[in-house]
């Protein structure tokens, strides 16, 4: 899922 991947990247960027 692209949306899930994008959200995952956002979370990784946060941490």
From Swiss-Prot:
This is Interstitial collagenase. It is found in: Secreted, Extracellular space, Extracellular matrix. Disulfide bonds: none annotated. It catalyses: Cleavage of the triple helix of collagen at about three-quarters of the length of the molecule from the N-terminus, at 775-Gly-|-Ile-776 in the alpha1(I) chain. Cleaves synthetic substrates and alpha-macroglobulins at bonds where P1' is a hydrophobic residue. The N-terminus is blocked. Can be activated without removal of the activation peptide. The lineage of its organism: Eukaryota, Metazoa, Chordata, Craniata, Vertebrata. It comes from the Eukaryota. Its main location: secreted. Its cofactor is Ca(2+); Zn(2+). Keywords: Calcium, Collagen degradation, Extracellular matrix, Hydrolase, Metalloprotease, Phosphoprotein, Protease, Secreted, Zinc. Belongs to the peptidase M10A family.
């Amino acid at each position: 899922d692209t949306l899930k991947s994008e959200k995952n990247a956002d979370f990784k960027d946060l941490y």
